[in-house]
Design a protein with these regions (language model features):
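Short, amphipathic alpha-helical segments
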Residues: 11-14, 22-23, 55-58
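Short, surface-exposed loop and linker segments with low hydrophobicity and enrichment for Pro/Ser/Thr
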Residues: 30-34, 107
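C-terminal segment of classical bacterial N-terminal signal peptides
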Residues: 20-29
């Protein structure tokens, strides 16, 4: 019986030691708010969300509404009108766009990696991961922001059309 107790004690101590090693070795997960704030800082400081206006124009220029504006005004004036409307509306959508992009980065990177990127860590390993995750972040962003982009473009085109009627 003492042999059995000794084996149990060894097994228990070994198990506890393994658990302790795992717990101490694994970095503590950051709070979601911390990751989101860190990711949002990355997006804002590196101007990663600045493409909203450009993407809005790319989407708008492929619509029937845009073609109608071109027929009514000519290509140059239609482009100018739509770009002006997108620029006017962009501040209403930019904060949510940046938040969605930050969430996509927070999903792809750890809090520590985001902090390193914010601190200007240009280590080859982190730079390679940043490039490698670009597609994943883009797909995540598309899923999060397709409706937002659609609303942005729709409002700009509606506004542009209404300006013709006045």
């Amino acid at each position: 019986m003492t042999d059995r107790k000794a084996r149990r004690l060894v097994a228990l101590n070994t198990g506890l030691a393994l658990i302790a090693c795992l717990v101490l070795d694994v970095p503590r997960p950051a709070h979601a708010d911390e990751v989101d704030d860190t990711a949002l800082t990355l997006v804002r400081e590196r101007h990663l969300g600045d493409s909203l206006g450009w993407l809005g124009y790319q989407v708008a220029s492929r619509t029937v509404t845009f073609s109608t504006l071109v027929e009514a005004l000519g290509k140059t004036q239609a482009q100018e009108l739509v770009q002006n409307e997108l620029q006017r509306l962009q501040p209403e959508f930019q904060a949510q766009w940046d938040a969605n992009l930050a969430a996509a980065y927070a999903h792809a990177f750890t809090a520590e990696e985001l902090r390193s990127l914010n601190a200007g860590d240009d280590s080859p390993e982190l730079a390679n991961k940043f490039r490698a995750k670009n597609g994943e972040v883009g797909a995540d962003m598309k899923a999060r922001s397709a409706d937002l982009l659609g609303n942005f473009v729709s409002q700009a085109l509606t506004s542009a059309q209404q300006s013709l009627e006045h």
